[in-house]
Structure formats: C-alpha cells, structure tokens
Amino acid sequence: MAEYKNYTLNFGPVHPAAHGVLRLILELDGENVVRADPHVGLLHRGTEKLAEFKPYNQSIGYMDRLDYVSMMCNEHAYVMAIEKLLQLEVPERAKYIRVMFAEMTRILNHLLWVAACGIDLGAMTVFLYAFRVREDLFDCYEAVSGARMHAAYFRPGGVARDLPTQMPQYQKTRFTSKRKAKKLNEPRQGSMLDFLDHFVVDFEKSLDEIDTLLTDNRLWKQRTVDIGTVTAERAKELGFTGPMLRGSGVAWDLRKTQPYEVYHKLEFDIPIGANGDCYDRYLVRMAEMRESNKLIKQCVDWLRANPGPVLSDNHKVAPPKRNAMKNNMEELIHHFKLFSEGYCTPEGEVYVGTEHPKGEFGVYIKSDGANKPYRLKMRAPGFAHISAMDELLSGHMLADTPAIISTIDVVFGDVDR
C-alpha cells in the first residue's frame, strides 16, 4: 500500500492574499494546515542603517516608507524619540495637530484593512466603499504637505506648517465632470477644520454602511468566527499588541496606559474582543475607527478655539520662518547650519513607543553626541504577529489562510525594514 505524505505548498510571495511579500511554506494534510513556516526579509531595505548615516531631520522621509499604510504614525514615534533625547518642548497646538493626524492615519489604515480583508474573502463592495472614504483623508494629507502619502509633516518640535485655511479643490477633467467636481467641492469651500467637521458626520454614515454589509452577514461570520483564535494569556506570551491583543480581550492601549501628547486630555474608549478570533479582531478595528472619529472631532473643536505656534522657537532644532530668515542674519545662520549639518543630540539612549494602528511601534535611538544616531532600532508590531503564524494557522483549512493573514494586518515595509 502506498505511503501517504503531507504536501508542501508555497503560499506567496506573489500571492494576492499575501499582503505584500509574505512567503509561507505550508505543510498540508489534505486541505488542513499542519505547519506554517513564514519567511520574511524579502522587502529588507536597510532603513535602520541608512538612518545612521544621515542627520536626524533627513530620516523623517524614511519613516513614512516603513509601514506605508500608516505613514504619519511612523513619523510620530521617530520625532518623539528625538524630542525626548533633546528634552524639547512642543507647542500645545502642534500636539493636537499630531494627534488629529495620527487618528486620521489610524482610520486610513483600518479602512484599507477592512477593504483588503473584504476582497480576500469575496466582499468586493466593501473595498469600493472604503476607498471612496480614504480619498477625503488623503486630501487632508495633501493640503498640509503636498503629498498624498509620504507627507514628512511631523518635525522635531512640532509640525512643518499650520493647518491650511483653504482645502484643495477638484477641477473638471476628462475623468471628472464639471457637475461631479462641483459636488465634491461642496464640503471643501472653507478651511481644513470646516472640512473635517463635515467629514466626521459623513464618516459615521460610511461606517454604518460597512457594518450593514459585514457585521451580521452570514457568509462573513462563517469565514471569521472561531478562526485564528488566540486566548488573552497566549496573546501576551506571543508579544501581540494593538488590535491583535485587544481582540483577545486585553485592554492594553498605550494612548490610555502610557499616555503621550494630549491623549490624557481627550475622551475615548478602548474596544476589546471576547473570543480572540478573526471576527473579534474585525469588530475591534471597526470600533476603533468610531473612537478615532470622536478624537478627530475633539481635536478640531480645540484647534478652532486655540490658535498658536505649531513649531518650537528653538532655532537650533527647528528652522526659523522664511521671512525672518531673509531679513535677519542670525536666522539665516540658523537656517544654513540646520539644513547643512543638522543638530547634535546629547549622548544617551531613548525608547519611545506609540499606539500605531497595527500595535506598538517603537523607536530606540542611541546617541554618541553627533548629528546622526549611533544606532537606530525600530520595533515593528507586525513582526511578533507574523512570528505566531504557525500557531494561528495550524489545524485550520487552507481556505482560512487568507482570513487569518488579513486579520493580522501585516505590512512588510516595517516588518522587514
């Protein structure tokens, strides 16, 4: 009688459900996964080493390209680490702007997650709905930085510039009719704060639409309930953070447990799951988007009532204003020194962790007193989640693999660095 052997299958790195360049070597018994061996490193670009050869300010652009779905959240941890090293005070208005954009980025991340997860499991409509909403937030990115993704907007000491008083307008093109452009421009007639007031109301309706499509959908629940279950205790042992940890019922969120910026002044809840399966992780992320929407509204109200500076007045670290630089020799010298040499930080080491959309994103900097880091290390939340892939997939069907990979919400820009 012939001997039965398990079958080995390469899943990725070019599979559309691999979410980047994930390569999984799956050992299958029929259609059941016996073992999963994740291979990482295919998107390694040497970001940490590159940053060690550039002045601090010139590495902000690298941060956007780590997790390229949560751009400003990467910048946030990096500039906070530099500020901690320099013991630099940040203006209150800049803190609120940072928090507001961090929450916008959280929504951008979770919308892409629900879109990709939906399309992996056959829910095409959600993909289209989510991308329609993301356009509004990309317009906000573009308004403050000129870039729709890699903004480099956060700076040590604050943000690059204040919020604009006029939003970008859509123009008639061969793809956009005059009538459609006029409709799109209706909420864009005022300032960014006016636009965001309009957005937070509309976004609740958009979330309700996605909720209606998925939350009680029989097929969606069959694909996600009791799939990829992780207990609270095991999630902590595996080093899970973010929605992966909260989906297992652990109320750990750095914005509450170790508050930074102005989170201690804002009101929001920490959504948690009960069973730790794919469905709970979906519910947690949906609830997080509603909480982020509340935080954006609170920031908009505060920013409207409190004008002020958005960048530190320490010109050893933050550039002087352009008109001052062109009329004053001292400011010109500061500007020249800052952009040619950068600034030196005191000797020492710091670690800053922030509540990234995917979990705890940490930046460790060791300084030897030079104008560039002696050592830069990033803690990517996705690395711990990918490491648990064998445990998450074992015992499930091959068809459950895309659902589990999706709910991990992994991006290889930060995993491989």
Curated annotation (Swiss-Prot):
Which PROSITE patterns does the UniProt record give? COMPLEX1_49K
According to the UniProt entry, its GO molecular function terms are: NAD binding; NADH:ubiquinone reductase (non-electrogenic) activity; quinone binding
Has keyword Cell membrane?
Answer: yes
Q: What class of enzyme is it?
A: translocase
Matching Pfam families, A to Z?
Complex1_49kDa
Arranged from A to Z, the UniProt key words for this protein are:
Cell inner membrane, Cell membrane, Membrane, NAD, Quinone, Translocase, Transport, Ubiquinone
The compartments listed are: Cell inner membrane
Q: Is tRNA processing a UniProt keyword of this protein?
A: no
EC no. given is 7.1.1.-
Q: Which reaction does it catalyse?
A: a quinone + NADH + 5 H(+)(in) = a quinol + NAD(+) + 4 H(+)(out)
Q: How does the protein associate with the membrane? A: Peripheral membrane protein
Please name the InterPro entries in this protein's record. Answer: NADH_Q_OxRdtase_suD, NADH_UbQ_OxRdtase_49kDa_CS, NDH1_su_D/H, NiFe-Hase_large
Q: What is its main location?
A: membrane
Q: Which domain of life is it from?
A: Bacteria
Outline the subunit composition.
NDH-1 is composed of 14 different subunits. Subunits NuoB, C, D, E, F, and G constitute the peripheral sector of the complex.
Function of the protein: NDH-1 shuttles electrons from NADH, via FMN and iron-sulfur (Fe-S) centers, to quinones in the respiratory chain. The immediate electron acceptor for the enzyme in this species is believed to be ubiquinone. Couples the redox reaction to proton translocation (for every two electrons transferred, four hydrogen ions are translocated across the cytoplasmic membrane), and thus conserves the redox energy in a proton gradient.
Similarity-based family: Belongs to the complex I 49 kDa subunit family.
State what protein this is by name: NADH-quinone oxidoreductase subunit D
